[in-house]
Regions:
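Glycine-rich, basic loop-to-helix element that forms the pyrophosphate-binding segment
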Residues: 60-76
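N-proximal low-complexity "stem/linker" segments adjacent to membrane-targeting elements
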Residues: 1-24
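A conserved acidic beta->alpha catalytic loop
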Residues: 39-47, 88
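Acidic donor-binding loop at a coil-to-helix junction in glycosyltransferase catalytic cores
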Residues: 178-184
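Short, acidic, metal-binding catalytic loop of nucleotide-sugar glycosyltransferases
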Residues: 24-32
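Short, flexible, basic/aromatic active-site loop/helix in glycosyltransferases
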Residues: 112-119, 128-152
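Conserved donor NDP-sugar-binding/catalytic core segment of glycosyltransferases
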Residues: 93-125
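Short aromatic/hydrophobic "clamp" motif used to bind/position activated sugar donors
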Residues: 81
């Protein structure tokens, strides 16, 4: 029997990592209700790989993670939405974990501990910093909400929530080119607590590999601090170039 979870994958030129991710999803028990890949105009084999895997493919009229994820959420039929990056591997019991967490009515959304990995190494320092950021970003910049259950989750943590709650707060802000996930967490928090699941998902270290670990963490910290004091996402985007 399948779960009530719709998995939504925003993608743009992800042929190098997508096959591995889709193969990983075939191991889920119970299987998701559906998997939707929302393509932002890929120029490689991303769409072909998704079609061969037998998953539903949506073509977004514009690229942009917020826009693509909202399009997937509108098309989804599951009662629960799970937003998965194309370079992230999840545990085989992902759907069971999600349904168990959201069975608690006081929890509105959740995510996982992201471990940044490559084929031959694990980025322990960056992964630990990202784990701490879930807590300290909320505590420092939104302390009144932290004590109401706010945790700041990012896309590589595989954010999930009820479809009803997602649309109650109008989904992802399509105007945000960056920090759309943190913004969503703040708006979702009005409906309940955000829960960090004590399980690991594995994300590609490709951005850290290109920037270097010190520079990457410095940029993450810089962007987070500026966002926390209200600097516009359009300005912050210049520091976070796309990496494939």
């Amino acid at each position: 029997m399948s779960s009530k979870v719709s998995i939504i994958i925003p993608a743009l030129n992800e042929e190098d990592v997508l096959t591995r991710t889709l193969n990983n999803l075939t191991l889920l028990n119970p299987p998701p209700q559906e998997i939707l890949l929302v393509d932002g105009g890929s120029q490689d084999r991303t769409v072909e790989i998704a079609h061969k895997a037998g998953i539903r493919v949506l073509a977004s009229p514009q690229s942009g993670r917020s826009i693509q994820m909202n399009l997937g959420a509108k098309a989804a039929t599951g009662k629960i939405l799970c937003f998965l990056h194309a370079d992230t591997l999840v545990p085989n019991d992902l759907t069971a974990i999600i349904e168990q967490v959201l069975a608690q009515p006081n929890i509105v959304a959740g995510g996982f501990i992201s471990l940044m990995t490559a084929s031959n190494q694990t980025r322990w320092a960056t992964s630990f910093h990202n784990y701490l950021k879930t807590y300290y970003a909320a505590l420092i910049f939104r302390p009144h909400l932290f004590f109401k259950g706010l945790r700041i989750l990012f896309g590589d943590q595989v954010i999930f929530c009820r479809r009803q709650d997602f649309w109650h707060c109008d989904g992802f802000d399509p105007e945000l080119p960056i920090m759309e996930d943190a913004d969503l967490c703040i708006r979702l928090c009005q409906y309940g607590s955000i829960y960090l699941v004590d399980r690991i998902v594995q994300s590609s270290d490709r951005r850290v590999a290109q920037w270097g670990e010190f520079k990457a963490n410095l940029i993450y910290l810089y962007i987070g601090c500026l966002w926390g004091i209200g600097v516009s996402a359009d300005y912050l985007k210049q520091f976070y170039e796309d990496v494939r």
